[in-house]
A protein has these predicted regions:
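Surface-exposed, low-hydrophobicity beta-strand/loop segments enriched in small/polar/acidic residues
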Residues: 1-213
């Protein structure tokens, strides 16, 4: 595992897989010891970007990564497929329970995902899932899904209490865990980090989000 600088942005149009593209404008306070997280099943070359929402239980303890996933294309209540674009280098796994978080922090219509099918060509980086009709109700293109606490539950598995300070690159097939320092107070470029629902941002009031566009 390697730590790189305060970097990384990935979107449909731009990728800087090992860049020095800055995301942090100012870091006032961080848990420098950070926490560790499991790399079980994580492929070599995976990048966990700076600015990823995380939850740290204690200094030097365990950090929970809170990846988000963007819906690609509108999804009707009768749809039986769902296409997602991972926002943080974390591919949604089979059985992962996700749902859309409302502005009130409610995760409506959470359900488990099936086996991901990687798309190719112009759709590379996106994954298609088979779903049961009305699993997620209706979703709009660009909606952000978060990990939910349980199928049918009305809340997220966890809320962030900070953002990752630097990007982490998995550079070995034998790595068992990674570590991340967590920023709790600072200023960050919100359009260079993984998209997240507004309720996530409200959960970390020490972070000020600035936008370029």
């Amino acid at each position: 595992m390697s730590n790189y600088g305060n970097a990384f942005f990935s979107s449909e149009s731009k990728q800087y897989p090992a860049s020095v593209m800055p995301v942090w404008l100012e870091v006032k306070r961080r848990k420098i010891a950070g926490g560790t997280f499991s790399l079980s099943g994580v492929a070599k070359g995976t990048i966990f970007p700076a600015g990823l929402p995380v939850r740290l239980d204690k200094m030097g303890g365990t950090v929970t990564l809170l990846p988000t996933f963007t819906v690609v294309g509108a999804v009707s209540s009768s749809a039986t497929t769902l296409v997602l674009r991972p926002q943080a280098g974390i591919i949604p796994a089979e059985g992962m329970i996700v749902g859309k978080m409302t502005s009130a922090g409610v995760v409506a219509k959470a359900a488990a995902l099936g086996t991901p099918t990687a798309l190719s060509g112009s759709d590379a980086g996106k994954y298609q899932f088979t779903i049961t009709a009305n699993d997620f109700g209706t979703l709009a293109d660009g909606d952000i899904l978060v990990i939910a606490s349980a199928a049918g539950a009305n809340k997220a598995a966890a809320l962030p209490n900070g953002l990752s300070w630097r990007q982490v690159v998995v550079d070995s097939d034998n790595a068992t865990y990674g570590s991340i320092a967590v920023v709790t107070d600072g200023q960050i470029l919100g359009d260079r980090i993984p998209a997240m629902p507004d309720f996530y941002k409200e959960a970390i009031p020490g972070i000020e989000f600035e936008y370029e566009l």
